[in-house]
């Protein structure tokens, strides 16, 4: 699933020889430019880009140790050799498990998959398939109940045992602010709306599916974002994939970060616009593409582009990195381009008021032309939104496929969003929303800091609630997920093709619902599994100078 020349996908490229622009590499340790400035004592609003930041911007990607990279490639090589051996044994009917053998009646069918994808699925993915699609039978809160299952045919099929694994610490759900629960004011309000309006609308917004709740929600979203108007949609993925084609088309240019989500990739490809990819969060790469676009224009004709649209995300969900929004906005203004910001993971999770990456950097929402986000994460609901100028929203109401053809959002879902958003804004008469935002920030710093102290390689920004812990080797993907579940901790493990082939990882998502006791329990188990599987690859560790309170951030870097 590597991207085509005009495409991109949600993963980070390999760093050749540890060379990274916008940052510095020393002893294989990669730090962003602002983190380097902070280490040198320039900790207030100073970057290499002219002081665009109003706060320190600390983002770290430690380079893969050479020995680990070699052993990872060797691991994949051994698995590949055994895969070919198993294919040989299947061909001659020697292997007992025949699930991967093509049936006689399908011999002449056209292949559904490419050879490598098929080989990878049956010989590598199947070995660790039990780590995914685990069914839960409770609210995805700080703890979940998981249905136990077993496989007697090497993970080709599963049978439920009837047992429930109760009270598993949930480190995988996008429940950033803890609103995914079945009790409380949000749920009570949603239940009342369900009684009054029912579960569904059974129509589109343009017909008879436009409820007063839709109008109330869109006005509230616009106030929350600080924009003129907003429009909501029933599906977050479709908010991107169906609206980008309405904004750009042939004769337009899309500049997309190489790690953008699949929904942005699909929307860009469906639009028919020309697509160019810039290196992840690399402003030199983006500026070069902008300059080339203006100087050379469209291919063959050399006519000016009708529009140039920059696509970025607030928080990148596989890397835990935060977009360099001040620099992106500066380039956008300099070269007269448009900016499309996907805040699926950052809205509610970043900023002193929970208003996302724009709030996090203290920027003006009017500097972002198209503000997109979802309600599936911080708000504990479903759907998405687009915010911006009123003229933009009026245009999308008549030209967006999601607006014209999709069924309207469910009333109880809207009420969940309305109630939780008012809570974040403090309009419910309590400080609960603000406390949740602060608690998430504290949990994030604490969890990241403790993992680094243990010696794990952790990617991303220190303020990002998405925390990737690097596993690297394919065998350790399955082993880590299984060992953590044995210890009553549910985690998400990720490998190729969602990541580069040697950068498999576990991804933790922090929540305001996590108490310090829950985090300490999870960290204790992670530490034990890290020792068991020898996952502590970092050559630099953070060591506490003193025993400090929960929210302190002063730590010393040491090198092994």
Curated annotation (Swiss-Prot):
Q: Which residues cross the membrane?
A: 65-85
Pfam family, any one = Aminotran_1_2
Task: Give the reaction(s) catalysed.
Answer: L-serine + hexadecanoyl-CoA + H(+) = 3-oxosphinganine + CO2 + CoA; octadecanoyl-CoA + L-serine + H(+) = 3-oxoeicosasphinganine + CO2 + CoA
Q: Where in the cell is it found?
A: Endoplasmic reticulum membrane
- Identify which top EC class this enzyme belongs to: transferase
Question: What cofactor(s) does the depicted protein rely on?
Answer: pyridoxal 5'-phosphate
Annotated GO MF terms = pyridoxal phosphate binding; serine C-palmitoyltransferase activity
- What modulates its activity? SPT complex catalytic activity is negatively regulated by ORMDL proteins, including ORMDL3, in the presence of ceramides. This mechanism allows to maintain ceramide levels at sufficient concentrations for the production of complex sphingolipids, but which prevents the accumulation of ceramides to levels that trigger apoptosis.
Where is it mostly found? endoplasmic reticulum
N6-(pyridoxal phosphate)lysine is found on 377
Q: Which terms are listed as keywords in the entry? A: Acyltransferase, Endoplasmic reticulum, Lipid metabolism, Membrane, Pyridoxal phosphate, Sphingolipid metabolism, Transferase, Transmembrane, Transmembrane helix
- One GO cellular component term: endoplasmic reticulum membrane
Q: Which GO BP annotation is one of this protein's? A: adipose tissue development
Q: In which pathway does it act?
A: Lipid metabolism; sphingolipid metabolism
Q: Might you give the EC number(s) for this enzyme?
A: 2.3.1.50
Give the multimer and partner information: Component of the serine palmitoyltransferase (SPT) complex, which is composed of SPTLC1, SPTLC2 or SPTLC3 and SPTSSA or SPTSSB. The heterodimer consisting of SPTLC1 and SPTLC2/SPTLC3 forms the catalytic core of the enzyme, while SPTSSA or SPTSSB subunits determine substrate specificity. SPT also interacts with ORMDL proteins, especially ORMDL3, which negatively regulate SPT activity in the presence of ceramides. Forms dimers of heterodimers with SPTLC1.
UniProt lists the family membership as follows: Belongs to the class-II pyridoxal-phosphate-dependent aminotransferase family.
* Task performed by this protein: Component of the serine palmitoyltransferase multisubunit enzyme (SPT) that catalyzes the initial and rate-limiting step in sphingolipid biosynthesis by condensing L-serine and activated acyl-CoA (most commonly palmitoyl-CoA) to form long-chain bases. The SPT complex is composed of SPTLC1, SPTLC2 or SPTLC3 and SPTSSA or SPTSSB. Within this complex, the heterodimer consisting of SPTLC1 and SPTLC2/SPTLC3 forms the catalytic core. The composition of the serine palmitoyltransferase (SPT) complex determines the substrate preference.
**Name recorded for this polypeptide:** Serine palmitoyltransferase 2
Q: Which organism is it from?
A: Cricetulus griseus
Gene name, Swiss-Prot/TrEMBL? SPTLC2
